């Protein structure tokens, strides 16, 4: 088995999908989890206005709507959390995503004060954060807020990780990578677009250039610039297609060096890092 085949198998990626079937699969997955653990009353998700959180948010609200109708349990809710750092550059996109999802509840937590306070406390301890590490601080502060909300609403935190993100480890460890349940896991980027199109999402929300937008020195830095490959390259690779050798090498290097991000904390029983 080639490394490409191993990666595809590990991430559960498929070369082709039926959008309606995958929508149903994710919604039923969320519903099944909530029904298995009836003490869970809410799904909590940060909404940025980008493709992934828009899709995950819509699936969450669909699952909650169906469960309330089927069980009569009106205590179930989906909580969409706005988590800007100061003023969000693409604020209108976020508002459009909220309008599309129609969440039961929308909360806004501006993380800038918390991030700056943490940075100042570290500075007083003799640690000066780089812009890159400050970006990770933002991602972790966002997740911290979501877990606080989940803790106070008997909820679980929903993630937006998918195969095209997981393969490169393009997420912050214990930031946006630290969630309870990931309904998009297995899909690549273009497949996520297919689901949103099937759900009649406004096109500009999934045709915009993806960006983590964490760095102050490089605001709205496109993911594809940071990664050195395009999402079309990554999707082709995940679909088992032949890609240029340098592209495959870049993707595989990302995968191998970020393996620790896709695993629980390393123990004496792990040996993947020795290979």
UniProtKB/Swiss-Prot annotation:
The catalysed reaction is: deamido-NAD(+) + NH4(+) + ATP = AMP + diphosphate + NAD(+) + H(+)
A biological process term (GO) from this entry: NAD biosynthetic process via the salvage pathway
Q: Which UniProt keywords apply?
A: ATP-binding, Ligase, Magnesium, Metal-binding, NAD, Nucleotide-binding, Phosphoprotein
**GO terms for cellular component:** cytosol
Q: Which GO terms describe its molecular function?
A: ATP binding; glutaminase activity; magnesium ion binding; NAD+ synthase (glutamine-hydrolyzing) activity; NAD+ synthase activity; protein homodimerization activity
Task: Please state what class of enzyme this protein is.
Answer: ligase
List the NCBIfam families: nadE, PRK00768.1
Listed name of the protein? NH(3)-dependent NAD(+) synthetase
Q: Which organism is it from?
A: Escherichia coli (strain K12)
């Amino acid at each position: 088995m080639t490394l490409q085949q191993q990666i595809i198998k590990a991430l559960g990626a498929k070369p082709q999908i039926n959008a309606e079937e995958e929508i149903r699969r994710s919604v039923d997955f969320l519903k099944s989890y909530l029904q298995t653990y009836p003490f869970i009353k809410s799904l909590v998700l940060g909404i940025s206005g980008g493709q992934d959180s828009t899709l995950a948010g819509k699936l969450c609200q669909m699952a909650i709507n169906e469960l309330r109708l089927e069980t009569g349990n009106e205590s179930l809710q989906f909580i969409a959390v706005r988590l800007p750092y100061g003023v969000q550059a693409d604020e209108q996109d976020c508002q459009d995503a909220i309008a599309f999802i129609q969440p039961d509840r929308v909360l806004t937590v501006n993380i800038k004060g918390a991030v700056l306070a943490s940075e100042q406390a570290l500075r007083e301890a003799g640690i000066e954060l780089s812009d890159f590490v400050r970006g990770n601080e933002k991602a972790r502060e966002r997740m911290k807020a979501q877990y606080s909300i989940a803790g106070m609403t008997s909820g679980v935190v929903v993630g937006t990780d998918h195969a095209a993100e997981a393969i490169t480890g393009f997420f912050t460890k214990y930031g946006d990578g630290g969630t309870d349940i990931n309904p998009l896991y297995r899909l690549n980027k273009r497949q996520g677009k297919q689901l949103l199109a099937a759900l009649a999402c406004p096109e500009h929300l999934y045709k915009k250039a993806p960006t983590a937008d964490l760095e102050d020195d490089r605001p709205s830095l496109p993911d594809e610039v940071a990664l050195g490959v395009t999402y079309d390259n990554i999707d082709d690779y995940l679909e088992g297609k032949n890609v240029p050798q340098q592209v495959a090498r870049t993707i595989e290097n990302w995968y191998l060096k970020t393996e620790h991000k896709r695993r629980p904390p390393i123990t004496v029983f792990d040996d993947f890092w020795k290979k």
